[in-house]
Amino acid sequence: MKLKIALAQINTKLGDLQANLDKHLALAEQARAAGTDLLVFPELSLTGYVLQDLAPSVSCRPEDGDPVFHQLLAASQGLDLMVGFVDEDSRHRFYIASAYLSRGQLVHVHHKVYLPTYGLFDEGRFFAPGNSVRAFDTRFGRFGMLICEDFWHASPPYLLWLDGADVLLFASASPGRGLNGEPKLESSAWVEHTNRAYAGLFTTFVAHSNRSGFEDGLNFWGGSTIFDPNGKLVIQAPYFEESLTTAEIDLNQLHRTRARMPLLRDERPELVQRELERILHG
């Protein structure tokens, strides 16, 4: 099966839900007209990143009764969408979230599990951490979603791999850091190495949508990528600018790669479980 994925590497307007929604809908229509199957937006694509105490005022509920998601669900009749937003639960806790929409239905929501609160980042002051990492079924196969810092920890992609995810969708709002006279930012080079490593180690497709533009002194570098199950780069978006970058992947490559390199077949989660119990409980 072939799957045409588009990475919506956008610049968002901080706190402006309507302007960001309009951009989502316009890109969804453009991607649909081009025959795209799945359009992947970055982290907090509907709100902007440096929200701090703005978070409650831009939160949404991923359901048809929400005015923002009503329009996004309608747009998902033509192609599947992964969008970034602030989710509010029934106890009024706020989460950095991504939603997967398909054929007018909500398929899955992921709440960011790891909230960086160091250096440039202050997420733990304003958001609650998610408490689950689960793969989900789509019309194209079994996928997993992660958000930025989740991918810097080995456990979430590993759990999704064990849970059956054959395509890892990764959304981020990653600012540029570390020029040091090199041709690439240190941060972008590190992210690309990590994405390539996960694709090869887990013999999965890894699609990463990173935002671009400036916000509150941060420069988001873009450079969105797709890697195949051999760890080879399929496509990369430009650095530091908005783009809609599209590639067609062949899901049959999973069969070819895993037949040649049966890492999933030989994985021993029961060993991991036993050793984790020893480490955690003595």
PLM regions: where:
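Extreme N-terminal starter segment of soluble prokaryotic enzymes
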Residues: 1-7
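Short polar catalytic/cofactor-binding loops
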Residues: 9-15
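Short amphipathic alpha-helices and their capping/turn segments at secondary-structure boundaries
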Residues: 22-36, 155-164
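A short C-terminal boundary segment appended to hydrolase-like catalytic domains
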Residues: 255-282
